[in-house]
């Protein structure tokens, strides 16, 4: 253990020196060594006002997040617990954005992050099952709440207009500092929080023995409450300094416990030291990879490692090895299809007409018809077509995985297709072209293969969490491509969130051939019914289940590729629409496929309309609206699945 402390200390010193050297300004090692004796030099000014505050910010934020992760995992007895996983970070981020943009004089920024972090963490515990909730369920609840908070944060940021670019960078986890103000004001809170946790180290050691043992030794609830409050303060301070940065609080404590650190008297200082090293290393690497004139936030670079870290932690958790779950709804609202289809048709017509009626204002039919035809109608049609494709893709994914929590977004297919599409843009592929769609298909297909291999013998909850981790890593890589390629950041991130903005009749023409997949799925409905019976029954009837599963996954990947190539990664439609369809029409795929397509089209069309009108003349990307609606529904599905 002493060797690890020594190694981490040497690495910390080396990384601090590296932090002072990288970046703009051409600072050399000689300048760093001679800075104290050359107080008026340009290099000394750069080091003192930019580089040193940034290095100290990385040390403080990394230490705070790692220490918070240690205590969360101890108190909750959950190796998946971390500020970013349990919605503390996203709650603090949302609160700080509200305080900065909407209520600038209501709360100081640091107080806002504490309140927001406490609300986020409290909601996570409330919907996830409390302090003794099952680990994966609590983590999924936190992720769902984080998605809803992030969607709301993005919507507020879009209203900021000229301030959006800077806030978008901060929201990605940016350590860059302009002077010592933030670091100096928040360093005492971080140091005091870590010191308080260290003083309670013995109580946390007792807590780690288990509830019965801790109660028998007379340990009350006060240390747990104090510990969780301290983690909220540490997380809030970290967000105030650098924005939301993930996976430091998850990876560092799990690594230290894996190598033998269990007593909190050693675990906490080791976590603080290693957390500082990890974040410094991420920031140095991000700056080295940044081309001149670009900034890769350290938080984005750290998020690239989300999938491997979370998958390794999931592998360490024992139990919960249910391999498959039933995705069939037991209750059917519409027993008579002569009622269901007219209702859906009416909603479809209403969504279409309202989409034409409302644009970037409330002028309605007073708007010139040529404007409606040229600008609004293509967007409405594309929203409906993409929603239908994503919904049917989710239906097939839930069939193949027998997992009610599966969807293009929870398994990472949408993000994989979007990443491949962005890579195509870098080599000159035209969006909407067949080659662009082929690249999106390749990205989605590779993710399907990856998730299929990783989720063997996993429970539905673990599979969903694995897919979300893969999606986070792919989204981070997409952000790096956007930054490095010097694309229009706001527009590119809007497309990544899923948007119909700027779509025209040419895009409608490009999307139309993909809609052939829906009648093809209807033709194959009997296959799907047999496949839904289970492997043994399906093979006894004569169906080659392996071949059927491969073709079904290919169909799902094709549907995702067609939608993402046109509108980007719209989330939650493919997760929610199939469940709504089962509730409306039952389990037979001959009815499920068209009903799912109609519900997906209706949901996406309404989301697009609300996105265009809620904060007009600005727009909220369709994917943000669906995420804000879908995240609570995802929590309901998860709670239903856990029963």
Predicted regions and their residues:
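Alpha-helical transmembrane segments in inner-membrane proteins
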Residues: 1-643
């Amino acid at each position: 253990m002493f060797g690890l402390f020594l190694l981490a200390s040497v690495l910390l010193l080396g990384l601090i020196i590296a932090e002072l050297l990288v970046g703009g300004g051409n600072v050399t090692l000689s300048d760093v060594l001679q800075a104290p004796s050359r107080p008026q030099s340009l290099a000394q000014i750069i080091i003192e006002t930019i580089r040193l505050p940034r290095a100290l910010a990385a040390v403080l934020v990394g230490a705070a997040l790692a220490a918070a992760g240690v205590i969360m995992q101890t108190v909750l007895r959950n190796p998946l617990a971390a500020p970013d996983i349990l919605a503390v970070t996203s709650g603090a981020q949302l609160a700080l954005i509200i305080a900065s943009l909407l209520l600038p004089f209501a709360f100081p920024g640091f107080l806002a992050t504490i309140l927001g972090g406490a609300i986020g963490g409290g909601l996570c515990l409330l919907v996830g099952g409390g302090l003794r909730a099952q680990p994966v369920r609590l983590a999924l609840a936190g992720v769902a709440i984080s998605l809803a908070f992030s969607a709301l944060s993005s919507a507020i940021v879009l209203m900021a207009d000229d301030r959006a670019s800077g806030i978008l960078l901060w929201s990605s986890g940016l350590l860059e500092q302009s002077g010592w103000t933030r670091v100096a004001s928040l360093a005492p809170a971080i140091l005091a929080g870590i010191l308080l946790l260290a003083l309670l180290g013995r109580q946390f050691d007792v807590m780690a023995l288990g509830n019965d043992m801790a109660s028998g030794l007379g340990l009350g609830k006060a240390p747990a409450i104090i510990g969780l409050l301290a983690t909220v303060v540490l997380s809030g301070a970290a967000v105030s300094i650098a924005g939301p940065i993930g996976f430091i609080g998850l990876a560092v404590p799990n690594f230290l416990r894996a190598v033998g650190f269990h007593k909190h008297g050693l675990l906490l200082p080791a976590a603080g030291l290693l957390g500082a090293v990890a974040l410094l290393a991420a920031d140095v690497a991000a700056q080295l990879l940044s081309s001149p004139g670009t900034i890769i936030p350290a938080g984005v670079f750290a998020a690239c490692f989300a999938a491997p870290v979370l998958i390794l932690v999931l592998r360490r958790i024992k139990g919960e090895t249910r391999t498959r779950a039933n995705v069939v709804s037991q209750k059917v609202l519409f027993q008579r299809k002569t009622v269901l289809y007219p209702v859906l048709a009416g909603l479809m017509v209403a969504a279409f007409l309202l989409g034409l009626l409302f644009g970037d204002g409330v002028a309605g039919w007073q708007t010139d018809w040529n404007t409606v035809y040229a600008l609004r109608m293509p967007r409405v049609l594309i929203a409906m077509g993409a929603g239908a494709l994503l919904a049917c893709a989710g239906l097939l994914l839930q069939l193949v995985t027998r997992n009610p929590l599966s969807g293009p977004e929870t398994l990472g297919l949408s993000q994989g297709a979007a990443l491949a599409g962005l890579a195509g843009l870098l080599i000159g592929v035209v969006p909407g072209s067949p080659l662009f769609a082929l690249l999106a298909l390749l990205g989605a297909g590779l993710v399907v293969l990856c998730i299929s291999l990783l989720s063997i013998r996993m429970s539905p909850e673990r599979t969903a969490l694995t897919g979300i981790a893969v999606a986070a890593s792919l989204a981070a890589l997409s952000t790096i491509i956007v930054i490095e390629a010097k694309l229009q950041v706001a527009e590119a991130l809007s497309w990544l969130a899923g948007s119909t903005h700027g779509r025209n009749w040419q895009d409608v023409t490009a999307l139309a051939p993909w809609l052939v997949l829906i009648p093809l799925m209807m033709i194959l409905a009997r296959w799907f019914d047999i496949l839904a019976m289970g492997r043994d029954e399906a093979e006894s009837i004569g169906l080659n289940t392996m071949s059927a599963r491969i073709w079904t996954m290919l169909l799902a990947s094709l549907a995702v590729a067609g939608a993402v190539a046109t509108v980007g990664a719209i989330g939650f439609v493919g997760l929610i629409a199939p469940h709504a369809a089962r509730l409306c029409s039952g389990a037979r795929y001959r009815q499920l496929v068209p009903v799912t397509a109609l519900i997906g089209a209706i949901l996406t069309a309404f989301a697009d309309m609300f996105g265009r009108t809620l904060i007009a003349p600005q727009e909220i990307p369709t994917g943000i609206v669906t995420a804000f609606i879908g995240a609570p529904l995802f929590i309901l599905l998860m709670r239903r699945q856990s029963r």
